[in-house]
């Protein structure tokens, strides 16, 4: 955009400030590129994400740990005129709209709370000797107790002893809701006093009257709901004046005259309660389901005494627990909890509330809550005292999350209680072992055996036979109902629990049956030992083995990727035969089936065996191995060449072998077959006997007969069948196969040309294992590859019609040293040698269409030197037994 130049307004020879600012502006201003309509910058996107993450509907999750308001639960139960019936559904928690406060508005009759000071509780050591609670007059602002049942006495532990001076009172809050929510000054002062007590780490010396201050939570609400069922089944006994337990939140319902009820079967769909370590202290329990229109269940008010939201535990004489865990005592409470829970860390355990699991056993919920609170308080004691065993005196324990603030003291439990709880713990562990054994027997064998737990106590292992049968406890019944065992498995578990270790001793009949079972697999394995296969799929055999009770194996004639060829004696004809045993691999079995198809076609076209191809006598399947039976031949022309130290065949033998080979392949081509795997290894002598003579003082083997047969039709392909991209062995592979231009019968002619060169020289023409090097050797021996083929190929071997080959590389040096033009390989210039190389040159033409056909090759002048008697194939007489030298 253009910039208008303005004159500099000078006053007194000095330029003005505006003029200097204009001079500093850039000469060219590039307008900012306009964003699209819905463009959101990175900063704005961050703000939007932050706003989405804010959620005020759940203060328990998105508020601080230190906020009391976020940790409150509805504490005052909804009163109902009718008693709470016993039901199998969990206690519902009334739904609270998110826009309302966490606690309901208090009634005008509620009074503010007076909290004791720390020093007021820890002083007066003389009160330790008192054995009973000292009643104190209730002031005008005393707590208003809830209605009591007739005949029951519920004592409220006062906040202070009567002998102590009155503590400083806090300013009353407008309501209990403000006190509980932490919005008033009372919550701040309580938090400050709690911090002061933690810093002093002093012990509470008052032993006569202990006050437990408890902020209600969902855990306590569920615990009180569990205790509500007890008055209906059993009347509450009159509790004695014993000291209340410091583990306030969840033990109270069980110790206020509500004995544990046997748990009812739990529904199969009810999920199990997660482990204690998995419960999050800030997790909000889900609302339990209840029927539509049903009123919320009311808690009995006779078991809880409240003063403006602060609950005091009623005293009870029942200190026993039935959960199988040892209570915390004055001498070894922390150790007992560590032994029971297997925990040595000081991790704070959730006491606010766990996910509400539908359960039919309300006392079981109380047991779980008791475990949570006991472990929490014991670990808190250990952390505050800094020792493994808590001190004898009580101390102030507070939850870091603000759920519980209580003055805990030592529990007064007897040795009988400890023994009873140990027995329950051992019984529960034995039950788990029994259930595990029942599942293992259901999945495996039918013998029920128990699994020993290394962590189990020695008491359960002593005198297993002398222990009388014990009835199933409530824990066992609850466990079985939770797992929903089938009837058969449940019967086994009951038998194991009733009989103890007697079920571990199997009967003699069971042992005899178990010993008799392995005999059947041994018979099968003994039958299979004769037909074992190795890791590659080859049949494992030894000399003298029988196949189908007809063929006796003598020795191995050859081995390849397809399988093995063995010499066998046919008991029917008493002659030696060659048995080709294919690998027990699906790929080679399918190839063998194709070979059988080709051999059957050749036998049909050549019933008199006049075309120099091998014929199959019979075939059969032997334990997954397809076996093909042939006439016994001699060694291959490659094996004989190798045994003769790669001395080339004489010219007359080369002439005869070439004639037979061209006629055999021509017979295949006439029947629309392509062999695709022509090589010296697949050309066998009918009789490979020889004589040895010295030539230049070196032994030289001379064959008696050069009659050959063409074998291995496993890769033979009919013209109408699918043609694989890559065929033939590497050294005898045609260029059109390497360049992936498609192949047909001329690829066999190329292979014949390579074989003729090897017969004449004794060495392989193209000794390589890489396509690019193979093409380079072809160009070195035969000249450049035609441009048409180079352009048609889809391979990456050519650049601009020329082979991508570096002549200065080490590979190029190897090609130059080992390859030379074809004519330079002639040993002499005799007419027969020249004629042979003419035939080889015509067979090794790059273009498949320009390559010599086999009928033309058989008319070549080179074969005019062959005697007529050698042009007729020899007859294979089954009565004769061809032998290999050395047999």
Curated annotation (Swiss-Prot):
Annotated region (Disordered), positions in chain: 77-147, 163-299, 313-333, 347-475, 504-533
Top-level lineage group: Eukaryota
SMART domains in the record: S_TKc
Disruption phenotype: Viable, but sterile. Defective extension of body wall muscle connections or arms towards the ventral nerve cord. Reduced expression of the late endosome marker rab-7, and the eva-1 and unc-40 receptors, which are expressed in muscles, and impaired recruitment of madd-4 to the muscle membrane. Double knockout with cup-5 results in increased expression of the eva-1 receptor and rab-7 positive endosomes. Double knockout with eva-1, gex-2, madd-2, madd-4, mkk-4, unc-15, unc-60, unc-93 or unc-98 results in severe muscle arm extension defects as compared to the single knockouts.
Regions of compositional bias (Basic and acidic residues) in chain numbering: 121-130, 367-377
Residues annotated as domain Protein kinase: 551-863
Keywords: ATP-binding, Cytoplasm, Kinase, Nucleotide-binding, Nucleus, Serine/threonine-protein kinase, Transferase, Tyrosine-protein kinase
Gene Ontology CC annotations of this record: cytoplasm; nucleus
UniProt GO MF annotations: ATP binding; protein serine/threonine kinase activity; protein tyrosine kinase activity
Biased composition (Polar residues): 177-192, 314-332, 356-366, 439-462
This enzyme's EC code(s): 2.7.11.-
Biased composition (Low complexity): 108-118, 217-241, 407-419
Biological processes, Gene Ontology terms: regulation of RNA splicing
Active site residues of this protein: 677
Residues holding ATP: 557-565, 580
Segments passing through the bilayer: none
Similarity-based family: Belongs to the protein kinase superfamily. CMGC Ser/Thr protein kinase family. Lammer subfamily.
Protein name, UniProt field: Probable dual specificity protein kinase madd-3
Organism: Caenorhabditis elegans
Lineage summary: Eukaryota, Metazoa, Ecdysozoa, Nematoda, Chromadorea
């Amino acid at each position: 955009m253009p910039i208008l130049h303005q004159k500099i307004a000078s006053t007194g020879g000095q330029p003005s400030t505006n003029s200097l600012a204009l001079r500093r502006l850039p000469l060219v201003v590039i307008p900012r590129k306009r964003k699209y309509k819905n463009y959101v910058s990175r900063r704005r996107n961050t703000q939007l994400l932050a706003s989405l993450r804010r959620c005020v509907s759940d203060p328990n999750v998105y508020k601080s740990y230190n906020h009391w308001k976020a940790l409150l639960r509805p504490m005052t139960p909804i009163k109902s005129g009718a008693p709470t019936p016993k039901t199998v559904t969990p206690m519902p928690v009334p739904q609270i709209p998110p826009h309302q406060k966490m606690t309901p508005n208090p009634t005008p009759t509620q009074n503010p709370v007076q909290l004791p000071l720390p020093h007021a509780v820890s002083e007066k050591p003389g009160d330790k000797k008192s054995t009973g609670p000292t009643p104190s007059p209730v002031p005008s602002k005393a707590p208003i107790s809830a209605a009591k049942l007739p005949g029951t006495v519920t004592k409220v532990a006062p906040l202070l002893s009567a002998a102590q001076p009155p503590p400083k009172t806090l300013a009353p809050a407008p309501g209990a809701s403000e006190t509980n929510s932490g919005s008033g000054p009372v919550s701040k002062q309580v938090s400050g006093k709690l911090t002061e007590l933690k810093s002093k780490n002093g012990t509470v010396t008052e032993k006569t009257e202990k006050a437990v201050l408890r902020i209600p939570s969902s855990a306590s609400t569920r615990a009180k709901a569990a205790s509500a069922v007890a008055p209906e089944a059993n009347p509450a006994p009159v509790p004695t004046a014993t000291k209340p337990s410091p583990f306030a939140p969840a033990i109270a319902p069980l110790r206020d005259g509500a004995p544990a009820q046997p748990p009812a079967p739990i529904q199969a769909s009810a999920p199990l309660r997660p482990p204690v370590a998995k419960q999050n202290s800030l997790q909000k329990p889900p609302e339990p389901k209840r029927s539509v229109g049903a009123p919320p269940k009311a808690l009995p008010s006779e078991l809880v005494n409240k003063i403006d939201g602060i609950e005091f535990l009623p005293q009870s004489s029942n200190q026993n627990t039935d959960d199988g865990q040892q209570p915390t005592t004055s001498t070894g409470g922390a150790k007992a909890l560590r032994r029971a829970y297997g925990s040595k860390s000081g991790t704070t355990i959730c006491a606010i509330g766990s996910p509400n699991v539908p359960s039919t056993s309300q006392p079981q919920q109380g047991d779980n809550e008791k475990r949570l609170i006991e472990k929490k308080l014991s670990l808190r004691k250990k952390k505050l005292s800094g020792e493994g065993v808590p001190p004898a005196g009580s101390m102030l324990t507070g939850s870091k999350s603000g759920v519980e603030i209580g003055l805990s003291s030592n529990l007064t439990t007897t040795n009988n209680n400890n023994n009873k709880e140990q027995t329950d713990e051992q019984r529960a562990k034995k039950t788990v072992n029994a259930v595990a054994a029942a599942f293992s027997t259901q999945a495996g064998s039918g013998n029920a055996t128990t699994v020993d737990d290394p962590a189990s106590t020695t008491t359960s292992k002593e005198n297993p036979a002398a222990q009388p049968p014990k009835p199933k406890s409530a824990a066992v019944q609850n466990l079985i109902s939770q797992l929903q065992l089938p009837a058969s498995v449940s019967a086994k578990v009951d038998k194991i629990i009733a009989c103890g270790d007697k079920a571990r001793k199997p009967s003699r009949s069971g042992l005899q049956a178990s010993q008799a079972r392995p005999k059947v697999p041994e018979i099968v394995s003994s039958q299979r030992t004769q037909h074992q296969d190795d890791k590659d799929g080859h049949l494992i055999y030894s000399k003298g083995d029988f196949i189908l009770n007809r063929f006796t194996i003598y020795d191995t004639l050859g081995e390849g990727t397809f399988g093995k060829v063995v010499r066998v004696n046919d008991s029917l004809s008493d002659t030696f035969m060659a048995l080709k045993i294919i690998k027990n691999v699906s790929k080679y079995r399918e190839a063998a089936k194709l070979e059988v198809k080709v051999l059957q076609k050749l036998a049909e076209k050549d019933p008199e065996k006049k075309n120099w191809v091998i014929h199959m006598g019979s075939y059969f399947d032997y334990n997954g191995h397809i076996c093909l039976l042939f006439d016994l031949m001699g060694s291959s022309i490659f094996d004989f060449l190798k045994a003769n130290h790669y001395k080339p065949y004489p010219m007359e033998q080369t002439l005869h072998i070439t004639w037979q080979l061209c006629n055999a392949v021509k017979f295949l081509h006439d029947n629309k077959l392509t062999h695709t795997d022509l090589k010296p290894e697949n050309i066998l002598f009918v009789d490979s006997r020889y004589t040895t003579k010295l030539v230049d003082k070196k032994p030289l083997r001379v064959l008696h007969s050069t009659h050959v047969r063409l074998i291995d039709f496993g890769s033979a392909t009919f013209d109408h069948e699918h043609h694989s991209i890559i065929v033939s062995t590497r050294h005898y592979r045609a260029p059109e196969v390497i360049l992936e231009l498609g192949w047909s019968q001329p690829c066999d002619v190329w292979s014949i040309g390579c074989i003729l060169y090897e017969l004449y020289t004794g060495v392989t023409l193209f000794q390589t294992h890489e396509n690019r090097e193979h093409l380079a050797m072809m160009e070195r021996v035969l000249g450049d590859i035609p441009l048409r083929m180079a352009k048609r190929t889809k391979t990456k071997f050519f650049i601009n019609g020329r082979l991508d080959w570096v002549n200065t590389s080490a590979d190029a040096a190897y090609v130059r040293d080992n390859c030379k033009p074809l004519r330079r390989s002639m040993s002499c210039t005799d007419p027969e040698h020249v004629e042979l190389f003419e035939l080889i040159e015509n067979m090794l033409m790059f273009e498949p269409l320009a390559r010599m056909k086999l009928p033309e090759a058989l008319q070549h002048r080179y074969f005019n030197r062959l005697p007529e008697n050698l042009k007729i194939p020899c007859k294979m007489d089954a009565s004769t037994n061809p032998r290999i030298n050395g047999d």
